[in-house]
Amino acid sequence: MPFSGHVPRKRFGQHWLRDDSILEKILLAADLQEEDRILEIGPGRGALTEKLLESNVKLVHGVELDAELIVGLKQRFAGQSRFTLQEGDALSVSLLPHDGIAANKVVANIPYNITGPLLERLIGRLGRSSEVKYQRLVLLVQKEVAKRILALPGQSSFSAMSVRLQLLAKCQSVCEVHPSSFSPQPKVYSEVIILDPLEKDERLDFLVERRVASIVQIAFLSRRKKLRNTLTKICPLDELEPLAYRQGINLNQRPQELAPMIWVQLARELERWDRSKKK
């Protein structure tokens, strides 16, 4: 029997999704087509993998770190030509299927303990593109992470992550997932989210993206402080004030009160200011 005797490993963040209704919602959110090539991070025991293959997609490529699960997955899907499997850490190994043709979608119940760095690898970061441009990512993540990704300005969950990801992808929620939907049950709720990475012509200029990343990181390190107290690490207050005024930015606000595009406007002003100083 595949997976007989395997005990979920806490250090790998293993929780098996066993709720068919949630699996169906994930498939629906992925908008699967016959020509789709799917990357699945951490297929585990293969519950989602099986549903993906039943959807008649062209290929499902799994990346799994747990050597015991690799054995079970090979047994479960033996003879399935549309399933390929790679052993390794999704943060470091190549994510390309064996034929070298990249997947176009990511559908995964990703381990909670690597969510942040894995998102950066899959979507890229401000000022740097990802290795592969995916059309859509449908991910099951910890609810607290989903709240930060989807948060609006002024909400307590609005963070540097909110700004970065909302400038890189269109983000939306699919559904909340109760702990009882998993075995073993996690201590927290989860959420299924959709991330549609922006097309190249929708992305900002990379210099502006890098500037946004820099000022957002500095500002949110002191999220309780007003912008006039944090951004002076970048630009003297007497020069910062007219820059902010031109964009209608109130420097008495705190970082979580500014929408992503306001950060972009501020970044552009600071880019111009920086260039003027170098002349």
Curated annotation (Swiss-Prot):
Alphabetical UniProt keywords: Cytoplasm, Methyltransferase, RNA-binding, rRNA processing, S-adenosyl-L-methionine, Transferase
Disulfide cross-links: none
Cellular localisation: Cytoplasm
Residues annotated as transmembrane: none
Annotated GO MF terms: 16S rRNA (adenine(1518)-N(6)/adenine(1519)-N(6))-dimethyltransferase activity; RNA binding
Gene3D superfamilies attached to this UniProt entry: Ribosomal RNA adenine dimethylase-like, domain 2, Vaccinia Virus protein VP39
InterPro entries in the record: KsgA/Erm, rRNA_Ade_diMease-like_C, rRNA_Ade_Mease_Trfase_CS, rRNA_Ade_methylase_Trfase_N, rRNA_adenine_dimethylase, SAM-dependent_MTases_sf
Recorded catalytic activity of this chain's protein: adenosine(1518)/adenosine(1519) in 16S rRNA + 4 S-adenosyl-L-methionine = N(6)-dimethyladenosine(1518)/N(6)-dimethyladenosine(1519) in 16S rRNA + 4 S-adenosyl-L-homocysteine + 4 H(+)
Binding-site residues, S-adenosyl-L-methionine: H15, L17, G42, E64, D89, N109
Keyword Membrane belongs to the record: no
Pfam families documented for this protein: RrnaAD
CDD domains documented for this protein: AdoMet_MTases
Its EC number(s): 2.1.1.182
Domain of life: Bacteria
GO cellular component term, pick one: cytosol
Protein family according to the UniProt entry: Belongs to the class I-like SAM-binding methyltransferase superfamily. rRNA adenine N(6)-methyltransferase family. RsmA subfamily.
Protein name as catalogued: Ribosomal RNA small subunit methyltransferase A
Origin species: Prochlorococcus marinus (strain SARG / CCMP1375 / SS120)
